[in-house]
Amino acid sequence: MIDVNNFEYMKIGLASPNKIRSWSRGEVKKPETINYRTLKPEKDGLFCERIFGPQKDWECHCGKYKRVRYKGVVCDRCGVEVTRAKVRRERMGHIELAAPVSHIWYFKGIPSRMGLVLDMSPRSLEEVIYFASYVVTDPGDTPLEKKQLLSEKEFRAYLDKYGRSFTAQMGAEAIRKLLMDIDLDKEVDGLKEELQTAQGQRRTRAIKRLEVLEAFRNSGNEPSWMILDVLPVIPPELRPMVQLDGGRFATSDLNDLYRRVINRNNRLKRLLDLGAPSIIVQNEKRMLQEAVDALIDNGRRGRPVTGPGNRPLKSLSHMLKGKQGRFRQNLLGKRVDYSGRSVIVVGPNLKMYQCGLPKEMALELFKPFVMKELVSKGLAHNIKSAKRKVERVQPEVWDVLEEVIKEHPVLLNRAPTLHRLGIQAFEPTLVEGRAIKLHPLVCTAYNADFDGDQMAVHVPLSAEAQAEARILMLAAQNILNPKDGKPVVTPSQDMVLGNYYLTMEREGAKGEGSVFKDTNEALIAYQNGYVHLHTRIAIPVASLGKTTFKEEQNSQLLLTTVGKLIFNEILPESFPYVNEPTAHNLEVETPSKYMVPTSTNVKELFQERDVVAPFKKGFLGNIIAEVFKKFKITETSKMLDRMKDLGFKYSTKAGITVGVADIVVLPEKKEILAEAEKKVDRVLKQFRRGLITEEERYDRVISIWSEAKDVIQDKLMGSLDKRNPIFMMSDSGARGNASNFTQLAGMRGLMANPSGRIIELPIKSSFREGLTVLEYFISTHGARKGLADTALKTADSGYLTRRLVDVAQDVIVREDDCGTDRGLEVEAIKEGNEIIEGLYDRLVGRVAFKTVRHPETGEPIVKKNELIHEDLAKQIVEAGVEQVTIRSVFTCDTRHGVCKKCYGRNLATGSDVEVGEAVGIIAAQSIGEPGTQLTMRTFHTGGVAGDDITQGLPRIQELFEARNPKGQAVITEIEGEVTNINEADKREITVKGEMETKTYSIPYGARIKVELGEQVVPGQSLTEGSIDPKELLKVQGMTGVQEYLLREVQKVYRMQGVEIGDKHVEVMVRQMLRKIRVIDAGDTEVLPGSLIEIQHFNDENKKVLLSGKRPATGRPVLLGITKASLETDSFLSAASFQETTRVLTDAAIKGKRDELVGLKENVIIGKLVPAGTGMNRYRNLDIVSDYDQQAVGTEEAVMEEAVTTE
């Protein structure tokens, strides 16, 4: 018996007529489905029990044999085998066609495969197949040519002239005769010779034909199998017919399509038996051909066959295609048992690794576990009574549930799952009510809020799944964001506000200058109202018990506030006492300016000193990162919980609210606006006199009003009290920003109209004063545009993520070191003088390719093949090194993936990347997830003008799809000097090199970037604009393009304030550049003009070079991500992505084998993915839990029991 779940590869091919007959259990001869009175299947019909198996388990059609004991008996009365009814899902039938028909995929696809094999145009093929023309299949000794088309008239004429000495036929049988006559070897050799000389169109055609013919020759498929003699009929359960509750029947469209085929086939048989006139037979054959076409791919040719209500019927092809097709709906996305969903609410008292699960939900999810436990505790006699107990919710069930649920993690998922942090594991705690409780700190990762979001719960069942959930997916383990390695669980909103309020200082607060003997005394004083949280006090350094103070400091006093004492209690003991929001305080020590001798008059000292700033959101993030660096994950998650509790507690105690009185009115606003009005009038006067153009007038008016708004904003922020609640909220980073405040208290400013052009009439009112009707109307433009954009672009971003995942899903860390001899030189990415991504960011977590030495002393800072961590990167930058060569994904030589050294550190864990990590998918998610932010930026400003960017998502798509960019720059192909810039009539630039001089014409309206006499290098842009990466590939080769794409993608994201690790972009760009176009095949096996993997190309060349023959030549190609996904070696992965029919047609002709190396293919066939714990090296590990795994089987056990007892 073969193991269904264990196979090495999957192969697809054309089926020969005999193969189809061998699959079949019998011929379907009648179009009938079921008998309308008995509702039993008709004999020899589409649902026949004799062909497809019994409808009820262990029961034949006529009822002579019932029960299991007759298993395997074939009934002598009705001929039905007694077996399980589920064989109706797997047994096939067939229809013997009275005339051959062509398979529409091979005849109609682009390019037409049949046409390429026969070297005929699709038009003439269509004429022959659909009985419009005759084709000469054997010219005999007449002057006619083989494959020549003849109309009815010509055929009659030649028949009269030559008699029967030639044969011409029509329909699919003629094509089959031609296909059978083809000698593949002869054709292939002829084409190879033709390729030596052919040029242009002929060459392209020859290459295409050669590809198809080689495919047939190598795969063992016969070209004549593209014509069908026998039609397979799929099992009836896959095209079911069900009775609705009105006595009517609903049936799958396929049954209608099969019925049409059978009807026409039977009619054709009858006509042939009767010896009907040829014109009638031809018409019937054409109708049969059309019926089979509709069955295989309805709507591909001509008008689709429609059902009731003019709805096109879904054919076999449609069953596979698109989001609702077999691939994406059922193979890649399955619904799972043991899952539930509910609304989420905040659970502020949960620990980092916990979630609250509603009791009734938990009971249903853990039902089998509870049942097993009830039996093993002796609370129920057997599984059946246990089930009854659970269903009646008897009180003892809850205690058992509490026990079962301990130590059993569940997965929580929020849609849309944009990155891997969208599913995390938690330990459930039972809660009353019907809402899931979620820890407030994981909201950022899920992008969740509590305005009605819902989340799904899944239960990992097996011991292995539980272990993986606990070790890899527990929320407390996922503190860092995989896209940039920064903490993702930073406190937000209330928590930030509470900690901000707690660490504020205030001059002259109650009890300023008090000195306490230790923290406890200070807290007692605070609780009794002698001092305030913001009071500046002093405390002996020694009483804090911190290990980070120096010896001599222990005898001094520390100047701090009561709030900061409380705040520091949550930090680990060996962490510096945090007294000011600076990096020095975090990383090194508490600054010594806060230490004073015990004899100091503290009160007087405080009067001279300035107030220290409180801790804002960013600084809290830095604290978390620093704690993580020093103490690793467990301590960090504990500290996060303490920080959360502190934040909630003190934001509550602070009682910070927002009232209308908190929005201050700016007295100078009237004057500022009047001044701006005057300026605008002046500009208008100049315009009326014709001194300036309409454009200039518009631009000046816009800039006058923007300036006015900025002045108001600056004055507002200056006049604000530091204790104003709204100011505190925006300053701490909890909510809001300066622009929001200006709109509340100052003026709303300029707005854009729906087309994005700024309306020159500003909104002078603020929300505090209220808008006039016209102003209100103008602001609705921007707000509405924001909402529409968001809705549209979210879909765009999701689709981008899908394409990225698809192109990189098989990139996995495969080995420790690939031993490459190339590295990548990196330096800071700059745009003009502005640094977009510094060298430090580009080095952290990468491996040095060669030793990095100090430029002055020559001392080695980093050795070859050593990982560069934060401190080393800092040293390199401080030493003044500007360029470092690192190991990069670009230069990695590993097959189907990357190696550990070239990838470097795993950003999500902060340690070395493991073999088996699916870095391709992580990269795709890291680039795709911020894609939604790139677009949603317009949404939050309520459409205030000036925030709209042309960059963003469209630019990212342009780069990854390798499209010709808008506003393309002209680049130079040679190195040399700019000798001529002609801007007047011809608009051209001349570059003179050592060997040649080139002149480039400049498109109208392009701004020139170079100056006369400037030295330029190949690939440098001569005009402003984006470079076309395909052009760059020709000029600079692979390295140039890789660096360009990396730089440009980083630019777009960094401009939006999104940080993404370089390595993610590198993984993507590498996938776009892994193919090579063969120019000349040399003596290798590869086909000229074909696209093949670079590594495969190199292998073939090595083979021929070793035997002293001529190698192939090729040039690298840059493919967009969509194209690259479709060009993958795995047909399963490509077919489930896009263009399903084309991919499958192609794969079938080539007889492709899918080796199942990527993740997607394995998900489709239901195997473990070959990444992480699913890799072969881990496959044979057994995880045994003390809690045995019988529980899941109990549901089935109940069912079995129920069946036997009936």
Swiss-Prot record:
Binding of Zn(2+) 1, residues: 60, 62, 75, 78
Q: Which UniProt keywords apply?
A: DNA-directed RNA polymerase, Magnesium, Metal-binding, Nucleotidyltransferase, Transcription, Transferase, Zinc
List GO molecular-function terms, semicolon-separated: DNA binding; DNA-directed RNA polymerase activity; magnesium ion binding; zinc ion binding
Highest taxon listed in the record's lineage:
Bacteria
What the entry lists under SUPFAM superfamilies is as follows: beta and beta-prime subunits of DNA dependent RNA-polymerase (SSF64484)
Q: Looking at the keywords, is Nucleotidyltransferase present? A: yes
Query: Cofactor: bound how, per the entry note?
Result: Binds 1 Mg(2+) ion per subunit.
One GO process term, biological-process aspect: DNA-templated transcription
InterPro entries, per the entry: DNA-dir_RpoC_beta_prime, DNA-dir_RpoC_beta_prime_bact, RNA_pol_asu, RNA_pol_N, RNA_pol_Rpb1_1, RNA_pol_Rpb1_3, RNA_pol_Rpb1_3_sf, RNA_pol_Rpb1_4
Q: Which GO terms describe its cellular component?
A: DNA-directed RNA polymerase complex
Catalytic activity annotation:
RNA(n) + a ribonucleoside 5'-triphosphate = RNA(n+1) + diphosphate
Q: Which residues bind Mg(2+)?
A: 449, 451, 453
Summary of subunit composition and partner proteins = The RNAP catalytic core consists of 2 alpha, 1 beta, 1 beta' and 1 omega subunit. When a sigma factor is associated with the core the holoenzyme is formed, which can initiate transcription.
Q: Which family does it belong to?
A: Belongs to the RNA polymerase beta' chain family.
Explain the purpose of this protein.
DNA-dependent RNA polymerase catalyzes the transcription of DNA into RNA using the four ribonucleoside triphosphates as substrates.
**Mind telling me what this protein is named?**
DNA-directed RNA polymerase subunit beta'
The organism is Halalkalibacterium halodurans (strain ATCC BAA-125 / DSM 18197 / FERM 7344 / JCM 9153 / C-125)
